[in-house]
Design a protein with these regions (language model features):
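Long, charged, low-complexity intrinsically disordered regions
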Residues: 1-103
Length: 103
């Protein structure tokens, strides 16, 4: 890394879609929960996570993270029109998020 020009964090606009092609697999454990929290802050309750088709390692990691997150009501592979098995759609619980904010 250049000491004169330290690398600045990249800011992303939060939308209902997260494309993981620009992220490393070891970043997903923090990225996905943070993304869900930011979506809930913006009242985005249906999200689409693009993980690519590949051999399924990223997809399995995404599904594992979604399965463990209590703010996720359910998830499934996207419809053919939304990317098929290269993307996952999840529905989030705003109610659960608001009760967690009060803790």
């Amino acid at each position: 890394m250049d000491q004169e020009h330290p690398q600045e964090p990249i800011e992303y606009q939060i939308s209902n879609e997260l494309d993981l092609h620009t992220f490393l697999p070891n970043e997903l454990g923090e990225l996905i929960p943070d993304y869900i929290g930011l979506c809930l802050q913006k009242d985005i309750l249906r999200i689409r996570i693009i993980h690519g088709k590949g051999i399924g390692t990223i997809r399995e990691t995404v599904h594992s993270l979604l399965r463990r997150d209590l703010r996720v009501l359910r998830f499934e592979l996207a419809s053919h029109e939304e990317g098929g098995w290269g993307a996952t759609v999840a529905w989030l619980s705003q109610t659960l998020n608001k009760s967690n904010d009060k803790m």
